[in-house]
UniProtKB/Swiss-Prot annotation:
The gene is nfo. NCBIfam families: nfo, PRK01060.1-1. Belongs to the AP endonuclease 2 family. Coiled coil: none annotated. Binds 3 Zn(2+) ions. This is Probable endonuclease 4. GO terms for molecular function: deoxyribonuclease IV (phage-T4-induced) activity; DNA binding; DNA-(apurinic or apyrimidinic site) endonuclease activity; phosphoric diester hydrolase activity; zinc ion binding. InterPro entries: AP_endonuc_2 (IPR001719), AP_endonuc_F2_Zn_BS (IPR018246), Xyl_isomerase-like_sf (IPR036237), Xyl_isomerase-like_TIM-brl (IPR013022). Keywords: DNA damage, DNA repair, Endonuclease, Hydrolase, Metal-binding, Nuclease, Zinc. Zn(2+) 3 binds at residues 179, 223, 225. The keyword NADP does not apply.
Length: 278
């Protein structure tokens, strides 16, 4: 089954109910939310989520398992000096996810800032292990990054290092098409890309996909998302992800820009579902 949806606003007054309603209107069967603004750690009480109303009206169309939560950008679990804040906050975030039954937390691995890359990779691993030990049920999906600035998690070697050091069924991967393209993986050569995935045995670990075109060329390390078929990747390649049987039942989430101050996820979902890749 194809699971296709988008990032959707989770906001007052309807929160989960409103997000699900908008997603269903877009003909989506999964969705991704932030439990607050991506740039802050400010959160409202779970009692405001309108969870019971969502369950009654939309849970058969978008199940709790298909509600992806994205951690805010500002936590840095790879920082040797700031990872304690990230750990404590993410434990609380997962507890909120437990309340609504959400299964996957997408997490940027962070950046090495003034420390070495290896120190930051190992700090991320230690942070995730501690978060997992203090929580239950939720799967942390490390997102593949574009290599902008001091980011870590920017290639399959680093992602594979995380997987093999953490070794936990509650740790997985979120594959972002714009990010890996900007990091230098030419996904337009789709079969070669799939072979690279298989070389690292990453396929069983991919639990979420972010499907975005890229405003910049291959290997640019920029991380600027483009609308579907408006960037350097193109519809033909992106549709292959949607229709690939290897990615059946994996939530595929659009994070594309708004056009004229409004989202066009409904149009992009329709385009991707109708385009049978060659």
């Amino acid at each position: 089954m194809i699971k296709l949806g988008s990032h959707i606003s989770f906001k007052s007054p309807n929160y989960l109910l409103g997000a699900a309603a908008e997603s269903v209107n877009n003909k989506a069967n999964c969705m991704m939310i932030y439990l607050g603004a991506p740039q802050t750690t400010k959160r409202v009480s779970v009692e405001k989520y309108k969870y019971n109303e969502y369950l009654e009206k939309y849970s058969k169309l978008i199940t709790p398992d298909d509600i992806i939560v994205h951690a805010p950008y500002i936590v840095n679990p790879s920082s040797v000096s700031k990872n304690k804040f990230a750990i404590d906050f993410l434990v609380q975030e997962i507890e909120k996810m437990n309340y609504i039954g959400a299964k996957y937390l997408v997490l940027h691995p962070g950046s090495y800032t003034t420390f070495s890359v290896q120190e930051s990779l190992d700090t991320f691993i230690a942070s995730v292990k501690q978060i997992l030990s203090r929580t239950k049920d939720v799967v942390i999906c490390v997102e593949t990054m574009a290599g902008k600035g001091a980011e870590v998690g920017i290639n399959f070697d680093q992602i594979n290092y995380f997987i093999h050091k953490i070794r936990n069924d509650r740790f997985a991967v979120c594959l972002d098409t714009c990010h890996i393209f900007d990091a230098g993986y030419d996904i337009r050569k789709y079969e070669e890309f799939k072979a690279e995935i298989n070389k690292y045995n990453l396929l069983p670990h991919i639990k979420v996909i972010h499907l975005n075109d890229s405003k910049n060329s291959l290997g640019s390390h920029k991380d600027r998302h483009a609308n579907i078929d408006k960037g350097f990747i193109g519809l033909e390649t992106l549709a292959k992800f949607v229709h690939d049987p290897d990615f059946d039942n994996i939530p595929i989430i659009l994070e594309t820009p708004w056009v004229d101050n409004k989202p066009i996820y409904d149009q992009e979902i329709k385009m991707l579902l109708e385009h049978k890749a060659k």
